[in-house]
């Protein structure tokens, strides 16, 4: 996959796309569990997800109880699949690397079942959404910022 950063256009073997998603989902029961250590686990895991699944994580913003993703992927990967991949792999890694989190939750799930997804256009709302996601961490250590 080749990406034109200036226009945020990606190219594959047989298609060219400009699809960016703003995805939001909270921690189960809206618990404030996204501390610095958990955020670091999420960022490290997101980098592995990028490599393994060819999902471009353009920005990640964490508040104490929810996360915002600005991402892009090949059109054959549905937004729901991106959410499923991200939630399942990050939850597994969080439970594996910070076992104390399990005591805060019951039922063995880290993320809620639901989520929000919207498309972000190149003209108009891209900068607004990107700024909003990056501002999730004003006054705290940033979860991840990528330009």
Each model region followed by its residue ranges:
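Basic nucleic-acid-binding interfaces
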Residues: 1-144
């Amino acid at each position: 996959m080749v990406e034109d950063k200036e226009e945020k256009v990606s190219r594959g073997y047989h298609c060219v796309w400009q699809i960016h998603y703003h995805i939001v989902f909270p921690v189960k029961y809206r618990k404030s569990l996204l501390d610095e250590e958990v955020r670091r686990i999420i960022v490290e895991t997101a980098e592995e997800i990028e490599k393994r699944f060819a999902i471009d994580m353009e920005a990640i913003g964490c508040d104490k109880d929810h996360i915002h993703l600005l991402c892009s992927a090949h059109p054959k990967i549905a937004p729901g699949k991106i959410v499923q991949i991200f939630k399942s792999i990050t939850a597994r890694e969080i439970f594996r690397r910070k076992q104390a989190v399990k005591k805060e939750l019951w039922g063995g799930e880290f993320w809620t079942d639901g989520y929000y997804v919207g498309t972000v256009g190149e003209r108009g709302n891209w900068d607004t959404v990107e700024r909003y996601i990056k501002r999730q961490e004003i006054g705290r250590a940033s979860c991840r910022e990528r330009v």
